[in-house]
């Protein structure tokens, strides 16, 4: 199993000020991708969590630097982005109806994966929840 160092991250704090700190590490699962973060959007949702002990940011883009053995849709070097949801079960009624944000088993920003955010060096995200960015689009946009 491969362990991924998340590098430097920016977390919320009780005062609401961002805290720069060392992120933890993650074990790369079979369908995970490691993203070296290039840019992050700032969303109003980030303001809701600024006093939480969690890595902030859920509108990230970057370059894939590692992939798990089951990943087929993206490869190392691909430019990708991700958002609020990190995973869902895929078999409940909500998922089947296209509402994976309502999945009772979902992992998403602010609820789970509190060590993963786009305000940092690296993120580990399930490959099914990243989106390729065409080369013609600058990552800053």
Residue spans of the language-model regions?
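Glycine-rich beta-strand-centered segment in the early N-terminal region that forms part
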Residues: 26-40, 48-93, 129-137
């Amino acid at each position: 199993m491969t362990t991924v160092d998340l590098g430097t991250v920016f977390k919320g704090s009780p005062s609401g000020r961002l805290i720069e700190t060392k992120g933890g590490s993650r074990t790369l699962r079979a369908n995970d991708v490691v993203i070296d973060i290039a840019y992050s959007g700032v969303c109003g949702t980030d303001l809701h969590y600024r006093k939480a002990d969690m890595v902030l940011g859920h509108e990230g883009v970057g370059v894939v630097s590692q992939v798990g053995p089951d990943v087929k849709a993206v490869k190392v070097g691909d430019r990708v982005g991700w958002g609020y949801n990190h995973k869902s079960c895929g078999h409940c009624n909500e998922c089947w109806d296209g509402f994976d944000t309502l999945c009772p088993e979902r992992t998403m920003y602010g609820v789970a994966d509190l060590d993963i955010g786009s305000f940092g060096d690296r993120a580990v995200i399930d490959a099914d929840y990243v989106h390729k960015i065409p080369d013609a689009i600058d990552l800053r946009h």
